[in-house]
Amino acid sequence: MAVNGIIGIKLGMTQVFVEDGTLVGCTVLQAGPCVVVQRRTKENDGYEAAQLGLVEFVKPQRVNKAMTGHFKKANVAPMKVMQEVRIEESKDETKVGDRVLVENFKTGELVDVSGVSKGKGFQGGVKRWHYRGGDASHGSMHHRAPGGIGGSSFPSRVWKNQHFPGHMGNVRVTAKNLKVVKVDTDENLLLVRGSVPGPSGTYIFIRKAKKAK
């Protein structure tokens, strides 16, 4: 199967001893199981892809009529979270109803994990953009203020995307090239080295690294 991605849930973090005895921080991810709900083909849609759905219990009354018909056509149970993933091989035999499991990933390979980061609300420039800040003493009255932005006679305006205080977090972020430390096929668990966007319990999408280093 050429599907190189899977939907999951971030469970939390732990520590694992690797082969050389080093203690590394890892994120525990529940990866799948997923089911192919829809198949996109180059003949009908112009590209090759598969729409995956995460297998978990969903109350039928929480699903609208349009999505109920969509799931009924695929002959699968209603699902809360779905994600479309591209398929590279045009002659791939992936079809509706196929299961996508964590066994598609191997220990030691690199993956990209996408999720929604933790929301921080309105934050200042020091926390949001890592400004150095002003002097902490000697009469300074600007400890955490942004300071000048260099807009005098030129350009006489504020540059677009100028770093200012504002809303921080709660955006979709991708952590790239995370190394798979362990794969547990019995419990559908994937341990990756390092941190992953979002709080525990958030939905994430795992795919094999696009730009592996």
Show where each model-derived region lies.
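Extended basic (Lys/Arg/His-rich) segments that typically form rRNA-contacting surfaces
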Residues: 1-213
